[in-house]
């Protein structure tokens, strides 16, 4: 298996963070990202870049982190006993975008690299990541385009790649206590190393580079759609699902908290405003009801199974 080039991965991730921030600033037209660099006592650090109160984006956070440690945390070794007793290095770019307009979906993307070392043994390494979309008032054309872009970037790596990682995304971003998906999915992959370093790195780069080209057209199409208090209230209510998932189920959040990561950066994904409502039920045949009946469940958006 080819030897991992951690410096090349880090260089790509830093460049990706810069390009995504520049692209989001262009889409917003008003807001700018403030950079906040930090160091981790146990080793490593990163830079959090946050845009708040923009014209289009209520809050957008794009975080780069590169942390090292003497021992893998419990969240990483729970199902992988071979990692116990190894030092680790983890780096990645993670982002969450919360738009102002309820007709614009929230989105999340992440690309990451882990390597665990032990004297006298080969390193254990893998790539992970993906991107997903969380609409409040979904438009089928947006969802289909989102999945078509995900499908197309996977094609050079094999016919089975998109269906596999699309299914994994549906399964991962699922809230069992609500019996619904967090959104309409996209791609999710982890433990990627079986094709060697170069090929695995190429795929991670394709996912990272494919995020903004998939999200930008949706932003341009929906950012000026008129909305009222009813739509805003529903958006804030649905944002609650984002909070529930991230604090209860998300492995990245748990990993960050268990490794002494920077809390502000880890919780950067939280929406700036959110509301809960007891026993909420959408009005029958409403746009809000359509989200529940037609979108918050796994679906073959590209009709590949026909």
Curated annotation (Swiss-Prot):
- Residues binding a divalent metal cation: 98, 108, 147, 177
Q: Name one GO biological process term.
A: protoporphyrinogen IX biosynthetic process
Q: What sections of the protein cross the membrane?
A: none
Required co-factor(s) are: a divalent metal cation
GO cellular-component terms in the record? cytoplasm
Q: Where does substrate bind?
A: 94, 110-112, 260-262
Keyword terms: Cytoplasm, Heme biosynthesis, Metal-binding, Oxidoreductase, Porphyrin biosynthesis
* Region listing for Important for dimerization, in residue ranges: 242-277
Reaction catalyzed: coproporphyrinogen III + O2 + 2 H(+) = protoporphyrinogen IX + 2 CO2 + 2 H2O
Pfam families given in the database record: Coprogen_oxidas
Q: Does the keyword Cytoplasm apply?
A: yes
Where in the cell is the protein located? Answer: Cytoplasm
Which residue positions does UniProt flag as site: Important for dimerization? Answer: 177
InterPro entries linked = Coprogen_oxidase_aer, Coprogen_oxidase_aer_sf, Coprogen_oxidase_CS
Q: Its domain of life?
A: Bacteria
- Active site at 108
Tell me the route in metabolism or biology where this protein functions.
Porphyrin-containing compound metabolism; protoporphyrin-IX biosynthesis; protoporphyrinogen-IX from coproporphyrinogen-III (O2 route): step 1/1
| Record's subunit section | Homodimer.
Q: Which family does it belong to?
A: Belongs to the aerobic coproporphyrinogen-III oxidase family.
Function, please? Involved in the heme biosynthesis. Catalyzes the aerobic oxidative decarboxylation of propionate groups of rings A and B of coproporphyrinogen-III to yield the vinyl groups in protoporphyrinogen-IX.
Q: Which NCBIfam families match?
A: PRK05330.1
By what name is this protein known?
Oxygen-dependent coproporphyrinogen-III oxidase
Species in which this protein is naturally found: Shewanella sediminis (strain HAW-EB3)
Q: Taxonomic lineage per UniProt? A: Bacteria, Pseudomonadati, Pseudomonadota, Gammaproteobacteria, Alteromonadales
Coding gene? hemF
């Amino acid at each position: 298996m080819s030897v991992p080039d951690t410096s090349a991965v880090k260089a790509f991730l830093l460049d990706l963070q810069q390009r995504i921030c520049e692209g989001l600033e262009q889409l917003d037209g008003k807001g700018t990202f403030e950079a906040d660099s930090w160091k981790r006592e146990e080793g490593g650090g990163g830079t959090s870049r946050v845009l708040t109160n923009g014209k289009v984006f209520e809050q957008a956070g794009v975080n780069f982190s590169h942390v090292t440690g003497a021992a893998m945390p419990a969240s990483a070794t729970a199902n992988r006993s071979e990692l116990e007793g190894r030092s680790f290095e983890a780096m990645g770019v993670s982002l969450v975008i919360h738009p102002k307009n309820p007709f614009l979906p929230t989105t999340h993307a992440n690309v990451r690299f882990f390597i665990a070392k032990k004297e006298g043994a080969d390193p254990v390494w893998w790539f992970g990541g993906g991107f997903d979309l969380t609409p409040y008032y979904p438009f089928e054309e947006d969802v289909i385009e989102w999945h078509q872009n995900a499908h197309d970037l996977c094609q050079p790596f094999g016919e089975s790649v998109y269906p596999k990682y699309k299914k994994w995304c549906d399964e991962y971003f699922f809230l069992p206590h609500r019996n619904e998906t967090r959104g309409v999915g996209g791609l999710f992959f982890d433990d990627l190393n079986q094709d060697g370093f170069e090929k695995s790195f190429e795929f991670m780069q394709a996912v990272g580079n494919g995020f903004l080209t998939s999200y930008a057209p949706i932003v341009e199409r929906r950012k000026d759609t008129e909305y009222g208090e009813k739509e805003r209230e529903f958006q804030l209510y649905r944002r609650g699902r984002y909070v529930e998932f991230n604090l209860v189920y998300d492995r990245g959040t748990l990993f960050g908290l268990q490794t002494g990561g920077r809390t502000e950066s880890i919780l950067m994904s939280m929406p700036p405003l959110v509301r809960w409502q007891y026993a909420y039920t959408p009005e029958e045949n409403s746009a809000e009801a359509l989200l529940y009946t037609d979108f918050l469940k796994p679906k073959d958006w590209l009709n590949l199974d026909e």
